[in-house]
């Protein structure tokens, strides 16, 4: 599953292996490399010299008497894996025995005096018997058809003859092998059999031309020369000519084009069409299973289901496994089958399908300390006498069908139930289906004709979607082997996605970084705690490297078939890997290896002559010596190995002498002369269909040279129409359960999909995100409609091409009116991130906070919804119609808490959930209000508060309101968090709440952290920064009066006597919550956010406006949004090294204007009818508030919050301290805090203070709250889990996890400088949180050695870069001298980000759909009105931007692939949006101005004038456009160009001609039309920018009016 690099070669090498001088005296010889093609090594893949041992694992065997057996003509597969890069190459080998004759006296002179004379003299002359091989290697291998193979040995009983007494004949093993990066096993095998047949046929043809020479000797000669045993110069010109053409055939085969996954197939004609059909090479697209070109169910047949699952358990749990068998083919394919069966997991350790017996020191690989899967021949351990098998290796004997456990093996855990029973049932059904007489559904010939069986397909679809998943029945696929393989893989995927195995896996992963490669932490403890049934198997599986790597791979998966299976798509026609299911949908490339003008055609047409003379070997072995070379024919395996050991086989890596061709002079003549048509043949032939079917036509069309192939690139001709028809039929059948979708809708989607990816139908691409729905055991208890949505693939899409249905929301939000029309969120591109449209696999009590935890990493959250692909965007109206869905917009939110139970519980009604959630929030608001007013929590409320705070989202909700720091926009960008003074009464109430929160965190930790524990960062920030002073005058002050501390003033004195400050703090916005229509449970929070990932515009009758207590004059002033959200503190975006974490409160401005269009990043939802722009910080209040804090209800049109610097999960950011330390020092400056009592001291059990204080403390304590220090602080796993949760939240807040697939793709496309900047951002985020983690652990008096160990482990786990890791190490080095509050808290990077959001309408007026356009640091994000990311336009892709103040329309030109697209938006704040984007782009350009120059202006392009047909050059210069043709030259000045655009490959230029005062249109046909248009637009932008800057310099400053 590793993303493999594209290899431009279909075949890397073709080699011939055997013995150059076969010996009749020994059973086995050292195998030698006899021929290799090409002669030179490829730079990135030299030919490994030990390939000879893999081709002949037990040596080059020889035998005297031939006995035909299944091993006489065999093929098998091996792999060669590069130990440095991990790249795997496949070897496909065909082994056969060619006969040779013992050296006779008359042959001594045969060598002549040539350079190989001596060698030839010792070479035994052989009469070739290879042409007689026709037996198959078993049911799994298919050599060529009977008509293409000589049949001399087809009837051994009738072929028995006595041998001539003067001939003692031997046969020697010979191997033909192909090495390739591509696993086309069956087709490569056919190529090798074809090569063998060509040599055999040429040998047969020579029999009639040399009547004086015995037939056997003459037939021998061809193979002896081909294998290098005889000199070329001595042989006849006819033989050399044949060999030359055979070698030219090999080189043409090596130059075959490579198929493109999901787009192009290659049809290779290796022999004339009437002799053998063309071989098809095709790769499935990523939405299908990866190609497995062998019987994957083979281990199930050989071992049985139970034993096979036992071996799979060993493999999954990382035990060492060795398989052995006499049959190489069964051995290697079984190993590869086991590896393929664990998909979507990947085996992370060495895999060697075939380890040769005769290779020296091969047994040392079995001593490796790591797990492995290795296949060895049955002779391996007998041959390695001195080797002792390690006592921890599981041995699987495929011949005896036994699994032998090692001596000290631990007992394998049994697979969990009921999943195990289901898996066994499905596997047995799949195997049983092969014994039935039912016909397979799909027919290969009909597929090539573009036909299908819609009746069966439709029935399958209806059955599939109307029955529970446990009714899965592989019999529906028919009884063909390929469908059984698909059924086997489907059963395994469904097993992994079951509740007791890996379902819900991604809920427990935390993305730590994406660049330079993804790093994901897997929280195994919470994962195991979420299993419905605790099993040893799941516990051990969770600790394996395969599961850990799966978390990284799933961020940007290279294959999506498992997601389609999770969405109940099982049909092989949709997910199958074999070309017969999809080849008809691909563009064909026809390539001819065989030249019909070659004289090889004559040899192929000669009927094989079979007489008694031509069969010198008795198949029955009935003459004097009953001796066979095959190990299977020995009385025992030991006898065979004993004979092998008598032979002198050198198993060391051989030193290969430079080889030559058998007859061909130089390969270059083949490559240049013969393959030139491939470069030119881009257009389809005039009648490519006929040229395939009619040999005379093809022959006449390729009249170049006798050895030159005619390479034909077929056009689409009639196939696209047929494949569209197939797609339509398939789509119609599949979408039958969705009656509202007319066939025309799916058809339009099919057409678009074909043009995009070449795959038949977008309707087939319906896979949900992994591990969401329960697949095994009892079905989840849900409402019928919700379960239907969860299990029903949605293929519908608007006929107009809109993407409205691609914008997902939880199923509970889907209303009955639009659930059918709602489509999947995935784009049709194979590389698109796949988003899930269901949250039903996990518990019903989901809230604002928990959803972020659940969705943070890939495609779960709205923030990560797939962006549309090119095809999805190219519509007449580029934006979807979102009208009609607005009722569902309420409560659409990103999640904060990712953990939740996997097993579903019966949820209460939506009204009940919404009511409970609102009541809980309102209750906690009142408690917080009471605390901030100095009235405390209250004895009667304490029990309920404790119970409610067991929910992480409610913990964050309360902590966000407790944090009492006021900030301005400038304060938000400061680095150090200021202390906050509160009154003693407020202190007491806050301490009670914090202690309740700690108790609830203890409860969460006891349940393995389910629900998340990042709130501890917010709690400890409050504890470290909030204090009361013991001075008498300060003890009489108001509870929250002094929170606003201006920079440079003593925090203890600032704000005194300021009534407004008191009013602000006393009136947090505690309006009642809007009832949630879709709450997941009683603890749900109805939260909304302008956050980049999760903006939600909620409109509807359920929304209740908040209640404000402020007077009219106060409404217009800046207020503290007490319920603004909090987000995790993280790395600062600033460049100075000491930028640190803190939190900032959302400042809310309530505007009385109904037309207000400014809203600065609040945690609130904007009214959908108002035209707003939000100056949103990416931090806590805006970004973070979306994650962790519950905000007040939706604002009305006039209630818009502004908060440019937003709060974080840790509460609000505090005012800057009067004295800042230099950036190099992490330690806080010393100050007089002797009279201050901080909240953290109460958490530790305060040991200072008067007796009166202690008595008062005791009186304030409740029976349920302990004064002692919690033991939670000593649990290192708790700190690790809290850190991982915090990283996830901060990444969400900074927009680092919005569509990880797109982010990774962009990273790979950037230059080195930009990549480094992105890596630095991630390092800074991680270092900031690690710094704060150290500070909090110090605060709670954690053992300092434990701090060092844990932080260093987390630092290594996060792969923090050298610069930032050095900073953390410096802090750890000073740890001995640090205590308590000595280490300052760094502010979060999310709070340093500033984003502005504007409400826009698609099109030129307000009739267009509403979108929210967010202007970020490096891109513009377009969100739908439910907060889903619709588009993300990176600044490097924007070409031009203009606006019209009169029409209020903004025009954006952007580069989309190779095309330039124009998008128009209407907004009342058109001018502000324009300058906002312009300023942001200028800042982005300034970051790389000195390092990365922009693209050069202008360029030259070939064009053809549409009027005259004349060709020429179009030059774009700074002065204008210059057109050069053969007979004339035209120059068009820049100021005369009125318009330019492209229309289907035609560049249209409109020129204003001053002489005639008219506009003249010029049209030029060119394949570079888009490049020309792009170049002209860049030129206009450049000229406009230059003129603007010049005007600014000339314009004098205006006098200021008095």
UniProtKB/Swiss-Prot annotation:
Residues 105-121 have a biased composition (Basic and acidic residues). GO terms for molecular function: guanyl-nucleotide exchange factor activity. Residues 614-629 have a biased composition (Acidic residues). The modification Phosphothreonine is found at residues 1040, 1045, 1194. It comes from the Eukaryota. Residues 138-156, 688-698, 789-803, 911-920, 1119-1134, 1191-1209 have a biased composition (Polar residues). Disruption phenotype: RNAi-mediated knockdown in hippocampal cells leads to neuronal cell death. GO terms for cellular component: axon cytoplasm; cytosol; membrane; plasma membrane; synapse; synaptic vesicle. One of its GO terms (biological process) is negative regulation of apoptotic signaling pathway. The modification Phosphoserine is found at residues 155, 688, 691, 778, 812, 817, 819, 857, 861, 895, 900, 909, 1038, 1089, 1196, 1225. Expressed in all tissues examined with the highest expression in brain. Residues 105-167, 603-635, 676-840, 870-920, 1030-1089, 1113-1231 are annotated as: Disordered. Residues 430-564 form the dDENN domain. Keywords: Apoptosis, Cell membrane, Cell projection, Cytoplasm, Guanine-nucleotide releasing factor, Membrane, Phosphoprotein. Residues 1295-1370 form the Death domain. InterPro entries: cDENN_dom, dDENN_dom, Death_MADD, DENN_C, MADD, Tripartite_DENN, uDENN_dom. Residues 157-166 have a biased composition (Basic residues). Pfam families: Death_MADD (PF23629), DENN (PF02141), PH_MADD (PF25328), uDENN (PF03456). Its main location: membrane. Residues 288-428 form the cDENN domain. Coiled coil: none annotated. Belongs to the MADD family. Interacts (via death domain) with TNFRSF1A (via death domain). Interacts with PIDD1. Interacts with YWHAZ. Interacts (via death domain) with KIF1B; links the motor KIF1B to Rab3-carrying vesicles in anterograde synaptic vesicle transport. Interacts with KIF1A. Interacts (via uDENN domain) with RAB3A, RAB3B, RAB3C and RAB3D; the GTP-bound form of the Rab proteins is preferred for interaction. Guanyl-nucleotide exchange factor that regulates small GTPases of the Rab family. Converts GDP-bound inactive form of RAB27A and RAB27B to the GTP-bound active forms. Converts GDP-bound inactive form of RAB3A, RAB3C and RAB3D to the GTP-bound active forms, GTPases involved in synaptic vesicle exocytosis and vesicle secretion. Plays a role in synaptic vesicle formation and in vesicle trafficking at the neuromuscular junction. Involved in up-regulating a post-docking step of synaptic exocytosis in central synapses. This is MAP kinase-activating death domain protein. It comes from Rattus norvegicus (Rat).
């Amino acid at each position: 599953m590793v993303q493999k690099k594209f290899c431009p070669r279909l075949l890397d090498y073709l080699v011939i292996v055997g013995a150059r001088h076969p010996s009749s005296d020994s059973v086995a010889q050292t195998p030698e490399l006899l021929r290799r093609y090409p002669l030179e090594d490829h730079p990135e893949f030299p030919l490994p010299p030990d390939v000879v041992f893999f081709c002949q694992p037990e040596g080059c065997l020889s035998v005297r008497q031939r006995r035909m057996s299944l091993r006489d003509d065999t093929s098998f597969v091996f792999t060669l894996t590069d130990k440095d890069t991990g790249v795997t190459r496949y070897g496909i080998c065909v082994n056969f025995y060619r006969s040779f004759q013992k050296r006779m006296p008359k042959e001594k002179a045969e060598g002549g005096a040539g350079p190989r004379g001596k060698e030839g003299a010792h070479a035994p002359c052989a009469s070739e018997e290879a042409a007689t091989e026709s037996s198959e290697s078993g049911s799994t291998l298919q050599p060529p058809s009977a008509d293409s193979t000589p049949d001399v040995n087809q009837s051994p009983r009738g072929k028995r003859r006595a041998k001539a007494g003067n001939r003692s004949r031997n046969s020697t093993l010979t191997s033909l092998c192909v090495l390739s990066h591509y696993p086309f096993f069956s087709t490569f095998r056919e190529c090798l059999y074809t090569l063998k047949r060509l040599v055999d046929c040429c040998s047969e043809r020579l029999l009639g031309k040399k009547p004086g020479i015995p037939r056997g000797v003459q037939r021998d000669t061809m193979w002896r020369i081909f294998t290098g045993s005889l000199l070329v110069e001595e042989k006849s010109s006819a033989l050399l000519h044949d060999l030359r053409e055979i070698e030219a055939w090999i080189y043409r085969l090596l130059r075959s084009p490579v198929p493109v996954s999901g787009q192009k197939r290659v049809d290779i004609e290796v022999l004339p069409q009437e002799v053998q059909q063309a071989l098809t090479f095709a790769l499935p697209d990523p939405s299908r299973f990866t190609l497995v070109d062998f019987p994957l169910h083979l281990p199930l047949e050989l071992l049985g289901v139970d034993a096979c699952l036992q071996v799979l358990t060993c493999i999954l749990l990382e035990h060492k496994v060795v398989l052995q068998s006499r049959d190489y083919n069964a051995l290697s394919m079984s190993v590869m089958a086991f590896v393929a069966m664990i998909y979507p997991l990947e085996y992370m350790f060495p895999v060697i399908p075939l380890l040769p017996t005769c290779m020296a020191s091969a047994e040392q690989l079995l001593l490796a300390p790591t797990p492995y899967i290795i296949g060895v021949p049955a002779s391996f351990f007998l041959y390695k006498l001195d080797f002792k098998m390690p006592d921890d290796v599981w041995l699987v004997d495929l011949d005896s069908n036994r699994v032998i456990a090692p001596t000290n093996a631990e007992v394998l855990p049994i697979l969990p139930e009921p999943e195990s029973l289901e898996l066994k049932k499905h596997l047995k059904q799949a195997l049983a289906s092969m014994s039935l007489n039912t016909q397979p559904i799909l027919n290969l010939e009909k597929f090539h004709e573009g036909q299908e069986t819609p009746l069966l397909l439709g029935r399958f679809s209806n059955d599939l979607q109307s029955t529970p998943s446990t009714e899965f029945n592989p019999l529906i696929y028919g009884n063909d082997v390929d469908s059984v393989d698909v059924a086997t893989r489907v059963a395994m995927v469904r097993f992994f996605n079951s509740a007791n195995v890996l379902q819900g896996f991604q809920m427990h992963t935390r993305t730590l970084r994406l660049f330079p490669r993804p790093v994901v932490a897997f929280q195994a403890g919470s994962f195991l705690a979420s299993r419905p049934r605790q099993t040893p198997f799941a516990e051990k599986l969770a600790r394996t490297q395969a599961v850990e790597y799966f978390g990284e791979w799933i961020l940007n998966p290279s294959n999506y078939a498992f997601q389609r299976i999770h969405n109940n798509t099982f049909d092989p026609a949709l997910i199958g890997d074999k070309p017969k299911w999809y080849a008809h949908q691909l563009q064909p490339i026809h390539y001819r290896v065989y030249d019909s003008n070659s004289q090889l055609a004559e040899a192929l047409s000669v009927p094989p002559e079979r007489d008694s003379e031509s069969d010198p070997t008795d198949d029955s072995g009935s003459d004097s010596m009953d001796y066979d070379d095959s190990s299977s024919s020995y009385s025992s395996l030991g006898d065979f190995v004993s004979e092998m050991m008598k032979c002198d086989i050198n198993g060391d890596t051989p030193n290969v002498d430079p080889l030559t061709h058998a007859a061909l002079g130089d390969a270059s003549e083949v490559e240049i002369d013969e393959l030139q048509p491939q470069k030119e043949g881009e257009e389809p032939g005039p009648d490519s269909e006929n040229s395939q079917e009619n040999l005379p036509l093809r022959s006449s069309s390729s009249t170049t040279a006798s050895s030159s192939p005619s390479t034909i690139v077929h056009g689409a001709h009639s196939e696209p129409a047929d494949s569209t028809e197939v797609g339509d039929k398939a789509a119609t059948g599949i979408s039958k359960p969705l009656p509202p979708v007319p066939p025309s809708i799916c058809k339009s989607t099919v057409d678009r999909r074909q043009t995009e990816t070449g795959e038949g139908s977008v309707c087939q691409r319906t896979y949900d995100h992994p591990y969401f729905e329960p697949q095994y055991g009892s079905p989840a208890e849900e409402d019928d409609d919700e379960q239907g949505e969860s299990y029903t693939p949605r293929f519908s899409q608007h006929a107009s091409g809109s993407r409205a249905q691609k914008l997902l929301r939880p199923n509970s939000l889907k209303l009955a009116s639009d659930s059918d029309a709602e489509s999947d969120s995935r784009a049709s591109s194979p590389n698109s991130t796949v988003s899930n449209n269901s949250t039903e696999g996990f518990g019903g009590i989901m809230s604002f906070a928990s959803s972020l935890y659940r969705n943070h990493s890939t495609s779960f959250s709205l923030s990560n919804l797939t962006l549309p692909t090119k095809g999805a965007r190219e519509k007449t109206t580029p934006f979807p119609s979102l009208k009609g869905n607005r009722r569902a917009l309420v409560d659409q939110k990103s999640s904060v808490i990712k953990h939740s139970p996997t097993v579903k519980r019966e949820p209460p009604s939506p009204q009940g959930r919404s009511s409970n959630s609102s009541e809980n929030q309102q209750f906690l608001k009142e408690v917080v209000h009471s605390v901030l007013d100095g009235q405390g929590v209250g004895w009667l409320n304490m029990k309920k508060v404790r119970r409610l705070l067991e929910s992480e989202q409610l913990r964050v909700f309360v902590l966000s309101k407790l944090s009492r720091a006021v900030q301005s926009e400038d304060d938000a960008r400061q680095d150090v968090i200021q202390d906050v003074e509160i009154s003693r009464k407020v202190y007491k109430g806050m301490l009670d709440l914090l202690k309740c929160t700690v108790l609830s965190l203890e409860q969460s930790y006891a349940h393995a952290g389910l629900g998340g524990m990042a709130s501890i960062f917010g709690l400890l920030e409050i504890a470290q920064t909030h204090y009361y002073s013991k001075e008498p005058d300060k003890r009489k002050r108001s509870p929250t009066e002094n929170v606003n501390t201006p920079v440079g003033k003593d925090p203890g004195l600032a704000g005194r006597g300021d009534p407004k400050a008191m009013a602000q703090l006393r009136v947090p916005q505690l309006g009642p919550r809007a009832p949630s229509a879709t709450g997941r449970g009683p603890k749900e929070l109805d939260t909304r956010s302008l956050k980049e990932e999760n903006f939600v515009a909620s409109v509807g009758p359920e929304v209740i406006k908040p209640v404000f207590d402020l007077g009219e004059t106060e409404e217009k002033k800046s207020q503290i949004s007490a319920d603004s959200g909090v987000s995790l503190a993280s790395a600062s975006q600033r460049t100075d090294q000491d930028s640190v974490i803190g939190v900032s409160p959302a400042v809310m401005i309530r505007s009385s204007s109904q037309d207000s269009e400014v809203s600065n990043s609040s945690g609130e939802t904007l009214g959908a009818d108002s035209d707003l722009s939000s100056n949103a910080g990416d931090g806590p209040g805006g970004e973070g508030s979306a994650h962790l804090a519950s905000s007040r209800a939706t604002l009305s049109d006039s209630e818009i919050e502004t908060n440019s610097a937003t709060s974080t999960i840790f509460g609000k950011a505090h005012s800057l301290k009067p004295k800042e330390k230099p950036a190099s020092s992490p330690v806080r400056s010393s100050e007089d805090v002797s009279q201050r009592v901080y909240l953290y001291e109460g958490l530790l059990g305060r040991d200072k203070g008067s007796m009166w204080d202690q008595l008062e403390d005791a009186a304030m304590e409740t029976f349920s709250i302990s004064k002692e220090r919690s033991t939670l602080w000593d649990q290192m796993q708790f700190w690790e889990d809290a850190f991982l949760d915090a990283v996830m939240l901060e990444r969400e807040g900074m927009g680092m996890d919005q569509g990880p697939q797109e982010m990774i793709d962009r990273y790979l496309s950037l230059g080195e400088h930009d990549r480094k900047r992105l890596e630095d951002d991630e390092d800074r985020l991680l270092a900031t949180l690690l710094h704060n983690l150290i500070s909090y652990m110090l605060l709670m008096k954690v053992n300092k050695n434990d701090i060092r160990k844990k932080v260093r482990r987390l630092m290594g786990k996060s792969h923090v870069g050298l610069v930032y890791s050095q900073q953390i190490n410096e802090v750890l080095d000073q740890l001995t001298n640090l205590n308590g509050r000595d280490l300052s808290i760094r502010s979060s990077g999310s709070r340093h980000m500033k984003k502005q959001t504007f409400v826009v309408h698609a099109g030129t007026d307000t009739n267009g759909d509403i979108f929210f356009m967010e202007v970020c640091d490096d891109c513009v994000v377009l969100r739908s009105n439910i907060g889903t990311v619709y588009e993300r336009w990176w600044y490097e892709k924007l070409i031009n931007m203009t606006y019209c103040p009169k029409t209020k329309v903004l025009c954006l030109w952007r580069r989309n692939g190779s095309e330039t697209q124009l998008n128009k938006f209407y907004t009342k704040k058109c001018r502000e949006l324009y300058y906002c984007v312009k300023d942001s782009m200028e800042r982005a350009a300034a970051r790389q101005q000195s390092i990365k120059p922009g693209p050069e202006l202008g360029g030259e392009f070939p064009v053809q004038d549409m009027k005259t047909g004349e060709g020429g050059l179009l030059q774009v210069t700074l002065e204008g456009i210059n057109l050069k043709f053969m007979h004339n030259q035209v120059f068009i000045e820049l100021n005369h160009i009125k318009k330019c655009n492209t229309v289907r490959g035609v560049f249209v230029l409109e020129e204003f001609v001053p002489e005639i005062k008219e506009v003249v249109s010029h049209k030029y046909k060119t394949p570079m039309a888009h490049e020309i248009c792009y170049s002209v637009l860049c030129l206009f932008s450049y000229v406009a920018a230059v003129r603007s800057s010049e005007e600014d310099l000339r314009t004098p400053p205006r006098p200021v009016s008095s």
